[in-house]
């Protein structure tokens, strides 16, 4: 009998094959039974709703109320426990949700460059955070709002029957599994190569009631959910209060502008993600090195250097190269560099699209000496703007039917994703002997001009981050 891991990998390959059957504007992936309600759960829901009392509600504490700091180590330990308890179906569901998040992430990323204006800077987007934020709102949505959110998430439905509806609890649990699978790998050899923390802030106008089942459901996605109330009538002051609160609680660099909000806004729904990846066997160079923003402009930036046997491929036809640097057995950093800096936009269009992972099959092992910038990036973006830019249904600018979130009048002011992304050296264990540097078969790869990157985890088929670095010192 084949090992369970082999069987799981084979099934994931089948899912990937189905994923290629996308048509038109909407992506169709099978089998959807992994993420929708089945007849049994529909019957349970019907019985529970019959004569069900009103959901208990509460008013969030004021934003100035004292709050304990987030314990990131405890968060990582919880994710490791989540991963350890996954059965085969849970892992398949995580892979399914990972692919759905990839498709949505590519769709949004492919339309956002002009909106962000990142030609001379650096930025990072998390497909899983985008998907998680919209799935969280779906948890609180009803009727037409729920229909449109389900369509954006990539799961079609045939009718209004319960068995065609996305199961938000399954999806949010799967998203936590996706995070757990990434983090747990770095613990296998007692080395925490990867850190991934997610915090949700639910900021409401004073007096607005939140439903307890909604907030409890968010804990399936992340155990740190922070409901707080504040006055939105002075938007600059409100944004400053939210930033100050989140930085005090997390210690991360965050960004909240409330640019899309108005004085009658009653809700800001914000997702904050911190990623830290350690480059095994890499070291920080003693002196900053030149990074060429364009043919005539350079900046001095901290650089990492390391050597190892990495997967690599150079596309002579489209003039770009890809280097895959492993974090763990199944998680890696993908580095994509145009041969000519002026081709960054073209290469971005070629590689960051729905079938882009196909070129990973062309990678082959090479002994490489790699030099690249140390990355500390912060990116904040309002999903309302990104959905509009991607020509997806612009449902977040209007009054929504979020009656599973609150019975009060809801007017969404902001749906923020804030990413704090760090890439640093881990000098505990060299990947290869540096004595090999002068051997002719060693390929020198130096990322000293604009490039793209992605963090990919094969175990959940999930692209956790997509990024563009035109200037490591300037972030969007």
Curated annotation (Swiss-Prot):
Listed GO CC annotations: blood microparticle; collagen-containing extracellular matrix; extracellular exosome; extracellular region; extracellular space
Effect of residue 34 to F: Risk factor for pre-eclampsia; alters the reactions with renin and angiotensin-converting enzyme
Compartments where found: Secreted
UniProt xrefs under CDD domains: serpinA8_AGT
One protein family per Pfam: Serpin
Beta-decarboxylated aspartate found at: 25
Positions annotated with a glycan in the UniProt record: 38, 161, 295, 319
Protein origin, superkingdom: Eukaryota
PTM text: Beta-decarboxylation of Asp-25 in angiotensin-2, by mononuclear leukocytes produces alanine. The resulting peptide form, angiotensin-A, has the same affinity for the AT1 receptor as angiotensin-2, but a higher affinity for the AT2 receptor.
Annotated consequence of substituting residue 259 to T: Risk factor for essential hypertension and pre-eclampsia
Primary location recorded for the protein, binned into one broad class: secreted
Keyword Kinase among record annotations: no
Effect of residue 198 to M: Risk factor for hypertension
SUPFAM superfamilies (UniProt xref): Serpins
Covalent S-S links between cysteines: 42-162
PANTHER family, per database record: ANGIOTENSINOGEN, SERINE PROTEASE INHIBITOR, SERPIN
Disease affiliated with this protein: Essential hypertension: A condition in which blood pressure is consistently higher than normal with no identifiable cause. Renal tubular dysgenesis: Autosomal recessive severe disorder of renal tubular development characterized by persistent fetal anuria and perinatal death, probably due to pulmonary hypoplasia from early-onset oligohydramnios (the Potter phenotype).
Subunit structure of this chain's protein: During pregnancy, exists as a disulfide-linked 2:2 heterotetramer with the proform of PRG2 and as a complex (probably a 2:2:2 heterohexamer) with pro-PRG2 and C3dg.
UniProt similarity note: Belongs to the serpin family.
Function statement: Essential component of the renin-angiotensin system (RAS), a potent regulator of blood pressure, body fluid and electrolyte homeostasis.
UniProt name for this protein: Angiotensinogen
Organism of this sequence: Homo sapiens
């Amino acid at each position: 009998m084949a090992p369970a891991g082999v069987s799981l990998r084979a099934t994931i390959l089948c899912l990937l094959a189905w994923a290629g059957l996308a048509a038109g504007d909407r992506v169709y992936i099978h089998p959807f039974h992994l993420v929708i309600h089945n007849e049994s759960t529909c019957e349970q829901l019907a019985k529970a709703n019959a004569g069900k009392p009103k959901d208990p509600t509460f008013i969030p504490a004021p934003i100035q109320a004292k709050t304990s700091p987030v314990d990131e180590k405890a968060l990582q330990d919880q994710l490791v426990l989540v991963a350890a308890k996954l059965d085969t179906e849970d892992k398949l569901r995580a892979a399914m949700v990972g692919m759905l998040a990839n498709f949505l992430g590519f769709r949004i990323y492919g339309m956002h460059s002009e909106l962000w204006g990142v030609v001379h800077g650096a930025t990072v987007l998390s497909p899983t955070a985008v998907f998680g934020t919209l799935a969280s709102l779906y948890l609180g949505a009803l009727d037409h709002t729920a229909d449109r959110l389900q369509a954006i998430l990539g799961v079609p439905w045939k009718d209004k029957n319960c068995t065609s509806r996305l199961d938000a609890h399954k999806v949010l649990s799967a998203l936590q599994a996706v995070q757990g699978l990434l983090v747990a790998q770095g613990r296998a050899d007692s080395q925490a190569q990867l850190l991934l923390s997610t915090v949700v802030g639910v900021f409401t106008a004073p007096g607005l009631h939140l439903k307890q089942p909604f907030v409890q459901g968010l804990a399936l996605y992340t155990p740190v959910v922070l409901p707080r109330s504040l006055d939105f009538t002075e938007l600059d002051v409100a944004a400053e209060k939210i930033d100050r609160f989140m930085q005090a609680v997390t210690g991360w660099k965050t960004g909240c502008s409330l640019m899309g909000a108005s004085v009658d806004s009653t809700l800001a729904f914000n997702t904050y993600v911190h990623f830290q990846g350690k480059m095994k066997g890499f070291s920080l160079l003693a002196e900053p090195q030149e990074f060429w923003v364009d043919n005539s402009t350079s900046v001095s930036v901290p650089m990492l250097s390391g050597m190892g046997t990495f997967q690599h491929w150079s596309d002579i036809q489209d003039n770009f190269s890809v280097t895959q640097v492993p974090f763990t057995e199944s998680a890696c950093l993908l580095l994509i560099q145009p041969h000519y800096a002026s081709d960054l936009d073209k290469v971005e269009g070629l590689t960051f699209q729905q079938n882009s992972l196909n070129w990973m099959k062309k990678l082959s092992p090479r002994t490489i000496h790699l030099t690249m910038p140390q990355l500390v990036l912060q990116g904040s973006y309002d999903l309302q703007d990104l959905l509009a830019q991607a020509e997806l249904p612009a449902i977040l600018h209007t009054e929504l039917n979020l009656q599973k979130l609150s019975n009060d009048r809801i007017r969404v002011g902001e749906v923020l994703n804030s990413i704090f992304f760090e890439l640093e050296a881990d000098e505990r264990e060299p990947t290869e002997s540096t004595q090999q540097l002068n051997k002719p078969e060693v390929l020198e790869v130096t990322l000293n001009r604009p490039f793209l990157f992605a963090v990919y985890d094969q175990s959940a088929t999930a692209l956790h981050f997509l990024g563009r670095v035109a200037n490591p010192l300037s972030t969007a």
